[in-house]
């Protein structure tokens, strides 16, 4: 399914309320922080961990200011929420759906293809 019209509407609505909003889901897996030698250092409390998804919606002024600061500092971020938070902003997270996957890696694309094929939808290629 990926992103739904309902998710898009809800995140846009929250962005008007909070200036910055994104979609996410609670993490189901146990997450480990490991050291450089691949040994576990700690286990964060899963109840506070969320996998952030898209869409991520921001007030233009807030986003552009954060982007300018990142350029000046030559910083790179894995998503736009990190860009905002590292520039002092707060991003409201609302619950999305586990089928709303990010297409970041080749494996993600293959998984999405499988999801569509299992639902009888085939628009690839």
Indicate residue ranges for each PLM-predicted region.
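Conserved core of the sugar-phosphate nucleotidyltransferase
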Residues: 2-94, 125
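Hydrophobic helical membrane-anchoring modules
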Residues: 100-125
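Glycine-rich phosphate/pyrophosphate-binding loop and the adjoining helix
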Residues: 90, 97, 114
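A short, conserved beta-strand element in the Rossmann-like catalytic core
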Residues: 1-2, 100
């Amino acid at each position: 399914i990926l992103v739904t019209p309902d998710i898009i509407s809800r995140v846009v609505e929250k962005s008007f309320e909070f200036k910055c909003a994104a979609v996410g889901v609670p993490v189901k897996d146990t997450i480990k922080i490991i050291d450089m030698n691949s040994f576990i250092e700690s286990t964060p409390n899963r109840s506070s961990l969320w996998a952030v998804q898209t869409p991520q919606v921001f007030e233009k002024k807030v986003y552009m200011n954060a982007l300018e600061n990142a350029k000046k500092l030559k910083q790179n971020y894995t998503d736009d929420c990190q860009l905002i938070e590292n520039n002092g902003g707060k991003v409201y997270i609302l619950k999305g759906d586990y089928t709303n996957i990010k297409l970041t890696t080749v494996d993600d694309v293959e998984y999405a293809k499988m999801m569509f094929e299992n639902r009888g939808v085939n628009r690839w290629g």
